């Protein structure tokens, strides 16, 4: 698999679990800037977290500090960058993220540009930023630093459109891509079946991407199906090894609403 080629075992625990074909979980963080939510994710058993710069309001300073904190807790820190910008990809990784999730990738041309930004030579043109946060400011050679970061870094692209599903094989064929993360939410929106992850058309899309991942040695990720256990089990059976959970804000909101409803029923007598 990508991320370990030519450099031995990665120091990224998520990479090593994926390479062992273990099922892995990720908590998306969109709201919290506190390291305490990272401690909660760790004690809950999540393998990784991702900080959402596409739909959240994180700054680069935010995701850098949180990425380093997550790393020190044994969680793999990923960042969903806001777009395909090379600047966001490079600065996010230089700030300490162990991988990027790039939204709305629909063609092999887009995937190649992402690899160009995220990978070191010969697969990309990322430059080593010298003594830097992801290396703990260790005084090591450029060759050694590049090898460590190349083995650590996960390059994940999201397939969220009908075009992306049609191009899954070509996207998977791009050297340097590690994972295709199928976004069932946006895909179901485009198909006019919002949220219906069990629809045969969504299942066919996952199967098409799964087959492409098998052919090219990529990992298959799942997003947008967390409330549907039967669908999740089915996707695991066809090769999915990474799943994105509900966001921190949605989990908190759900808990707050449930608590308010319980108190309304047992104490205040007011319907909420």
Predicted regions and their residues:
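Glycine-rich phosphate-binding active-site loops on the catalytic face of alpha/beta enzymes
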Residues: 99-110, 180-189, 240-258
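Conserved anion-binding
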Residues: 87, 99-175, 186-189
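Alpha-helix-loop-beta-strand connector modules within alpha/beta enzyme cores
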Residues: 60-94, 116-124, 147-150, 198-220, ...
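Conserved, mostly hydrophobic/aromatic
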Residues: 27, 52, 92, 100, ...
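Short, acidic/polar
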Residues: 29-43, 83-91, 162-174, 226-234
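Conserved N-terminal beta1-alpha1 strand-loop-helix module at the mouth
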Residues: 2-77, 81-84, 116, 155, ...
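C-terminal alpha-helical cap/extension of soluble enzyme domains
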Residues: 4, 85, 126-138, 159-166, ...
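N-terminal amphipathic alpha-helix/helix-capping segment at the start of soluble metabolic enzymes
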Residues: 1-28, 138-151, 207-215, 271-272
């Amino acid at each position: 698999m990508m991320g370990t080629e030519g450099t031995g075992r990665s120091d990224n625990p998520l990479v090593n679990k994926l390479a062992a074909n273990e099922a892995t979980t990720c908590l998306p963080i969109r709201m919290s800037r506190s390291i305490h939510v990272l401690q909660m994710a760790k004690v809950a058993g999540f393998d990784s977290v991702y900080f959402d710069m596409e739909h959240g309001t994180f700054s680069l300073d935010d995701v850098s500090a949180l990425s380093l904190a997550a790393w020190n807790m044994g969680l793999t820190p990923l960042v969903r960058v806001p777009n395909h910008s090379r600047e966001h990809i490079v600065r996010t990784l230089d700030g300490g993220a162990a991988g990027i999730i790039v939204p709305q990738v629909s063609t092999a041309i887009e995937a190649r540009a992402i690899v160009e930004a995220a990978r070191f030579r010969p697969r990309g043109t990322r430059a080593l930023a010298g003594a830097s946060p992801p290396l703990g400011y260790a005084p090591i050679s450029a060759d050694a630093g590049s090898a460590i970061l190349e083995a650590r870094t996960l390059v994940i692209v999201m397939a969220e459109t009908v075009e992306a599903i049609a191009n899954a094989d070509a996207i998977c064929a791009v050297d340097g891509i590690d994972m295709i993360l199928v976004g069932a939410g946006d895909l179901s929106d485009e198909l006019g079946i919002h949220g219906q992850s069990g629809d045969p058309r969504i299942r066919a899309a996952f199967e098409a991407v799964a087959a492409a991942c098998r052919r090219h040695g990529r990992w298959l990720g799942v997003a947008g199906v967390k409330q549907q256990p039967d669908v999740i089990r089915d996707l695991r059976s066809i090769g999915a090894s990474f799943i994105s959970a509900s966001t921190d804000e949605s989990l908190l909101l759900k808990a707050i609403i449930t608590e308010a409803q319980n108190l309304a029923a047992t104490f205040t007598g007011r319907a909420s």
